[in-house]
């Protein structure tokens, strides 16, 4: 299992979350097996999320997809995301 973390700012959390939730079917279709979203304790526009994948290749393909980039832009992501991949220790 690969867990991908992503952190990025958003213009408006409620707008972003609605778009994120609407992208569920697409996420599953691109190999996401589980996910969760968090807001920074001192800045609700600072979002961190994790997504689980079966393989690193699936996670990397998800990150590189035009579909994801378009969805993030439409959802109001205002900065370049920081992304990292982990495996269970």
Regions found by a protein language model. Name each.
Residues 1-70, 74-89:
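Short S/T/G/P-rich N-terminal loop/turn motif that feeds into the first structured element of a domain
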């Amino acid at each position: 299992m690969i867990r991908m973390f992503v952190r990025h700012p958003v213009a408006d959390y409620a707008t972003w979350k609605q778009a994120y939730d609407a992208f569920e079917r697409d996420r599953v279709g691109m190999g996401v097996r589980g996910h969760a979203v968090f807001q920074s304790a001192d800045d609700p526009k600072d979002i961190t999320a994790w997504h689980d994948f079966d393989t690193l290749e699936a996670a990397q393909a998800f990150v590189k997809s035009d579909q994801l980039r378009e969805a993030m832009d439409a959802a109001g992501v205002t900065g370049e995301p920081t992304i990292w991949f982990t495996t269970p220790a």
